[in-house]
Amino acid sequence: MSIILGIDPGSRITGYGVIRQNGRHLQYLGSGCIRMSEKELPGRLKQIYAGVSEIITQFQPDVFAIEQVFMSKNADSALKLGQARGSAIVAAVNADLPVYEYAARLIKQAVTGTGAADKAQVQHMVMTMLKLPARPQADAADGLGVAICHANTNKTLIALAGKATGARRGRYR
């Protein structure tokens, strides 16, 4: 049994989802968004770090999973997203959590069955898979999707005993 924290990073809104995996069973523990009120990027990065640290303290996860940066036509946006990811990863590393990274297409495929799913499809499937009473906010659903992807990939990793799956794992120290 493990508690998985999934993060959908963003420089303005960072979504998170926390689930408990017990074998094949997934249980919803919490989700939400860290909304940045600071106007300047350094202040927003500090808010991401503090917010993720608070979530880690509250839920005590065993594992941290985060979406990888995808290539964007706007280089500035991709750089800001990378910095937001870095702030969240540092919070996980400071808590001695193993960090796993997943591509957006892999996350969508794990949740919906197709890597080309839109946000509404991800929201609907997350709601269905976790038996939620209502559709979660889009960024929170994406955070839950990252956690679900890790839970499914982790089962596959165990089954394949370390063969390549497209997931990256690391302990950043």
From Swiss-Prot:
Active-site residues from the entry: D8, E67, D139
Gene3D superfamilies for the chain: Ribonuclease H-like superfamily/Ribonuclease H
Keywords from the named record: Cytoplasm, DNA damage, DNA recombination, DNA repair, DNA-binding, Endonuclease, Hydrolase, Magnesium, Metal-binding, Nuclease
Pfam families: RuvC
GO function terms (MF aspect): crossover junction DNA endonuclease activity; DNA binding; magnesium ion binding
UniProt-listed InterPro entries: RNaseH-like_sf, RNaseH_sf, X-over_junc_endoDNase_Mg_BS, X-over_junc_endoDNase_RuvC
PROSITE patterns per the UniProt record, alphabetical: RUVC
Required co-factors: Mg(2+)
GO cellular component: cytoplasm; Holliday junction resolvase complex
Residues that coordinate or bind Mg(2+) 1: D8, D139
Reaction equation(s) it catalyzes: Endonucleolytic cleavage at a junction such as a reciprocal single-stranded crossover between two homologous DNA duplexes (Holliday junction)
Keyword Cell membrane annotated: no
Binding annotation for Mg(2+) 2: E67
GO biological process, one term: DNA repair
Record SUPFAM superfamilies: Ribonuclease H-like
UniProt xrefs under CDD domains: RuvC
Cofactor note (record): Binds 2 Mg(2+) ion per subunit.
Subcellular location: Cytoplasm
EC number: 3.1.21.10
Main location: cytoplasm
Source superkingdom: Bacteria
Subunit annotation: Homodimer which binds Holliday junction (HJ) DNA. The HJ becomes 2-fold symmetrical on binding to RuvC with unstacked arms; it has a different conformation from HJ DNA in complex with RuvA. In the full resolvosome a probable DNA-RuvA(4)-RuvB(12)-RuvC(2) complex forms which resolves the HJ.
Family of this protein: Belongs to the RuvC family.
Function: The RuvA-RuvB-RuvC complex processes Holliday junction (HJ) DNA during genetic recombination and DNA repair. Endonuclease that resolves HJ intermediates. Cleaves cruciform DNA by making single-stranded nicks across the HJ at symmetrical positions within the homologous arms, yielding a 5'-phosphate and a 3'-hydroxyl group; requires a central core of homology in the junction. The consensus cleavage sequence is 5'-(A/T)TT(C/G)-3'. Cleavage occurs on the 3'-side of the TT dinucleotide at the point of strand exchange.
Listed PANTHER family: CROSSOVER JUNCTION ENDODEOXYRIBONUCLEASE RUVC
The protein, known as: Crossover junction endodeoxyribonuclease RuvC
Organism: Aliivibrio salmonicida (strain LFI1238)
